[in-house]
Regions:
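Interface amphipathic segments
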Residues: 1-132, 140-239, 243-264
Length: 264
């Protein structure tokens, strides 16, 4: 069958795959044969506007085939978001065993999908990662393991600050994504040390505990009251904890303001 702009989310809904969200418009050729109870199926697809958890990853070029011997769907794909932004995906999904194992080789992969997980305190993610991750586990208890190193910037909503990082290392283990003593920078390239983790239950019910040790670091920068009773710019030395879950963020500050700070 020739496919033209088929909604990927619709297809995943048909096979009851809701572990993580993929979207896009798939075109290409799919062949399904069943001779004397000997099923065979394969497809060569191009998926435009391919996204993972609302994060754009470019155009996905995917070869998919039914592995009769192992009774699983083998997937070999590349998400092409430009010459320096490639994501290689190789692995399988087994509906019979209710299991997934997808290896993800990130080569300048966009980290925009983090907004879907950390949107209660973070947005405007402009970051890219390199490393290797596995999406693996029972389809109802999916997990993420591996390591990735990222560069770019994020915006912390409650603080109204942009922070950049040159080589932030994240280590994913079951139900946790860990960061240990990594350097982040404010707009003046002042340094703070970030540690902590993003916790999840099979990539759902996310929560987070992040700790920042700062020296003369931009910790708050607003130009109007908004929801606060104050506004201003604060450079601080000390410690900041960011804790929370979806829809709820608590920021604990134990820091001294530095010269140049202004609060109205």
């Amino acid at each position: 069958a020739d496919l033209k702009d088929v909604d990927v989310a619709y297809v995943l809904n048909l096979i009851n795959f809701h572990s993580v969200d993929f979207t896009g418009k798939a075109s290409g050729k799919a062949i399904i044969k069943s001779l004397f109870n000997d099923p065979d199926a394969y497809a060569q697809l191009d998926v435009k506007e391919f996204t993972f958890e609302n994060g754009p990853l470019g155009v996905l070029h995917a070869g998919v085939n039914f592995n009769k011997e192992l009774e699983q769907i083998d997937i070999h794909a590349v998400a092409d978001d430009g010459p320096e932004h490639q994501t290689l995906i190789n692995g399988y999904v087994s509906p019979k065993r209710n299991y997934i194992d997808l290896g993800i080789d990130a080569q300048g992969t966009s980290m925009k999908f983090l907004e879907n997980f950390c949107g209660s305190f973070m947005n405007q993610v402009e970051a890219w990662g390199n490393g290797y991750l596995n999406v693996v586990g029972d389809l109802k208890n999916i997990n993420l393991v591996g390591d990735i190193t990222a560069h770019g910037k994020v915006h912390l909503k409650q603080l109204n600050t942009d922070y950049t990082f040159d080589a932030l290392h994240a280590h994913a283990i079951p139900d946790d994504i860990l960061i240990e003593n990594d350097t982040i920078f404010d707009r003046n390239r002042n340094i703070a040390i970030l540690s902590g983790g993003i916790h999840h239950k099979h990539l759902t019910r996310l929560s987070y505990d992040l700790d920042i040790k700062a020296h003369n670091f931009l910790g708050f920068d607003t130009r109007e009251f908004g929801d606060n009773t104050f506004y201003g710019t604060i450079y601080a030395t000390g410690e900041v904890g960011i804790h929370g879950k979806s829809g709820e963020t608590v920021i604990d500050i134990n820091a001294e303001p530095e010269p140049g700070s202004l609060l109205e």
